[in-house]
Each structure stands twice: as structure tokens, then as C-alpha cells.
């Protein structure tokens, strides 16, 4: 699954960043990636590699066995939506991940935590990274690591403050979009003029309910599910 792949590559990157951070002799109470130019460059290289891996995994799983329409699907999931592309969002969330790692490593350095133990705590707190046990311990001992490194504690109402959750939602949504776009394309090639949308779950959702109330016409550009993250709706094509 994308979640398992994402977990593996994000925490391989975290392991590498912890190792290079511990390699440089940065004063414990002043730790930041930018304190040392070589450290900063090594971290940026690891994050750039992570971004490429996330893009590759997402595109591969979105295309899956539908290689006959590979270029169309990749172009579709990489289109601009609400002013940003898939790559823009991956870049933003991996930058957020880098900041989460920076504050966790700063805490680990202060507390003299072993590399393996620090990595374990980062994995454990991936869904609420600023509640990492070492960050909390450093803060309770009077080291304001979160504010010193200027890490936002919230990204706004309804938005996760976890880069892992954000990337998991984003990539799974893109993969689902790729599959549904292919399904709609094949339906049109087979003579379908539109579709009805049906709920795939009983979870209360006004948007999904609304989409079931009318006949969607392909030529109108009517939206195909998923309509939002975790959407379980599906379509039934309709021909003349």
C-alpha cells in the first residue's frame, strides 16, 4: 500500500538525517540544520531524494496496470488544482517534514538521546509530531525548541499538523484520482455519455450525497470521484 511505502521511505530519510545531524558538532543548545552549511546541504539532498521517491511511488500506483494510458493519467494527477500541483503539495509537505525532524533532532541532541531511540520516537509521534516525547521533555526542561526553530504549531482549522498524514492523504487521493480517471475514460470509449455517482460508505457527507442526486454528463466536465480525501464513492456509466 502507499501508506506502507510512504512510512518506509520517510523514515529511511529520517534515519539518514539523524545520522548526518549527529555527525556534525553543533552546540547542543543551538542545533539547527542551517547552523552548519555542509549539514544543511546533506539534509537538502536527502529531502530532495525523498520528494522524488514519493512522486515516483504515487505515479506508479496511479497508473498501476493501466499502462496504455500512462501519459494521460500522469498528466491528469499532476494538473493544477486550487492553484497548486501534486508536486507543489509534495514539496510543501516534505519541507514541513524537514521542520518536524529538525525540532525532534534538536531535542534529541539536547537530551543526549541515542539515534535509534530518537528515530523510534519520531515514528511513534508521526500523526502528532510536536507531541514527540523528546520534544515535550526538552520543552519541559526549559528549552523552547519549537519556538526557537520557528515551527508552526498549527496550519489552520481542519488542516493536519502532521506531514505524514498530509502526504498519506495527498498520495492516496492522487492514486484514486488516477484509477477513476482511467475508468471514466474507458467508459467513454465504450460509448458511455455520463454516469451516476453512488455512495460507497455510510459516513455522513453532504458533498457525496449531493453528487448522487443528478446524472453526470462526461461532456460537461462533471466531476468524477474521489470528491475529497477518503472518498469511497463510485460511478456506474450510462450509455444511450
Where are these predicted regions, by residue range?
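Acidic, glycine-rich two-metal-ion catalytic cores of nucleic acid-processing enzymes
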Residues: 146-240
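N-terminal leader/targeting and assembly helices and adjacent pre-domain segments
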Residues: 1-157, 239-240
Amino acid at each position: 500500500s502507499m501508506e506502507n511505502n510512504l512510512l518506509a521511505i520517510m523514515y529511511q530519510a529520517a534515519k539518514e538525517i539523524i545520522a548526518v545531524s549527529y555527525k556534525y558538532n553543533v552546540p547542543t543548545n543551538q542545533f539547527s540544520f542551517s547552523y552548519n552549511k555542509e549539514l544543511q546541504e546533506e539534509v537538502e539532498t536527502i529531502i530532495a531524494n525523498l520528494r522524488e521517491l514519493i512522486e515516483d511511488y504515487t505515479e506508479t500506483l496511479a497508473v498501476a496496470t493501466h499502462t496504455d494510458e500512462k501519459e494521460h493519467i500522469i498528466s491528469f494527477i499532476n494538473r493544477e488544482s486550487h492553484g497548486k500541483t501534486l508536486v507543489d503539495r509534495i514539496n510543501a509537505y516534505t519541507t514541513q517534514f524537514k521542520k518536524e525532524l529538525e525540532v525532534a533532532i534538536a531535542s534529541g541532541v539536547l537530551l543526549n538521546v541515542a539515534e535509534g531511540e530518537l528515530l523510534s520516537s519520531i515514528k511513534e509521534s508521526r500523526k502528532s509530531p510536536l507531541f514527540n516525547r523528546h520534544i515535550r521533555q526538552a520543552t519541559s526542561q526549559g528549552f523552547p525548541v519549537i519556538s526557537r526553530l520557528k515551527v508552526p504549531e498549527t496550519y489552520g482549522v481542519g488542516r493536519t499538523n502532521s506531514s505524514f498524514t498530509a502526504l498519506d492523504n495527498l498520495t492516496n487521493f492522487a492514486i484514486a484520482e488516477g484509477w477513476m480517471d482511467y475508468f471514466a475514460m474507458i467508459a467513454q470509449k465504450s460509448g458511455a455519455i455520463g454516469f451516476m455517482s453512488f455512495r460507497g460508505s455510510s459516513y455522513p457527507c453532504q458533498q457525496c450525497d449531493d453528487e448522487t442526486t443528478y446524472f453526470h454528463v462526461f461532456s460537461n466536465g462533471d466531476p468524477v470521484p474521489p470528491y475529497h480525501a477518503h472518498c469511497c464513492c463510485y460511478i456506474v456509466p450510462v450509455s444511450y
